Amino acid sequence: MDEQWLPDLLRLRGSVAAASDEFYAAKENLIKPDAPSFVPEMYDAKGQVYDGWETRRRRGPGGTLPDDTARDWVIVRLGVPGVVRSIEVDTAFFTGNYPQACSADASSASGYPTPEELTAEAHRWQEIVPRALLTGDARHAFKVNSGRRFTHIRLNIFPDGGVARLHVHGEVVPDPAMLEGLTVDLAALENGADIAARSDQFYSSPRHVISPELSRVMGEGWETRRRRRPVTSGWSSV
């Protein structure tokens, strides 16, 4: 299975619940739908503006360097629950201020837990991506082998730094309790539908057609390459 072909569960109206720090750049940037960008001459009161989530440098008493366990973290709520198959950590444009390493944990929670509940010691997390090294200005894909259904992801970075985007690819598994008594769109991605096959996705994926968000630009629709006789039609199967 190509995990990158699976839907991004975080992009389906996901949100950012909490973070240990966001001194240099806001945690919400992690889930922006646009590709990361960088403007070299753009500064604010805190320095160079980065399109991502960036924490301050961690220091111990007297300015000592952090030990190997020091970390920052961010918790995101998936737009729809699902079985996570891969996580992608993108450090685009973070070249001297990227984290040395990362790991990821997952949780399955009912309802809408508060940030305080998600960060409480009693809240249970399962490691799904062991600690792994990162490099700057690069996309890092980590395969996830757990077959469990999750609602929240916690990304840990060691010891601090910046991440441009977070992607969580997997299979949508909606909560039946949220659909009970409702008339739902059975062809909607957020209700568990998906693209079974397609003739072509040269320019963009047919999954855009069943995604919940309205298209902002042409690239957020489905477009195939030009066809000539004898084959003159494209198709997708939901």
Short names for language-model regions:
Residues 78-80:
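A short glycine/threonine-centered beta-strand motif
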Residues 1-68, 85, 93-121, 143-236:
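Juxtadomain low-complexity/linker regions and immediately adjacent membrane-anchoring helices
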Residues 113-141:
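Beta-rich interaction modules in large eukaryotic scaffold/regulatory proteins
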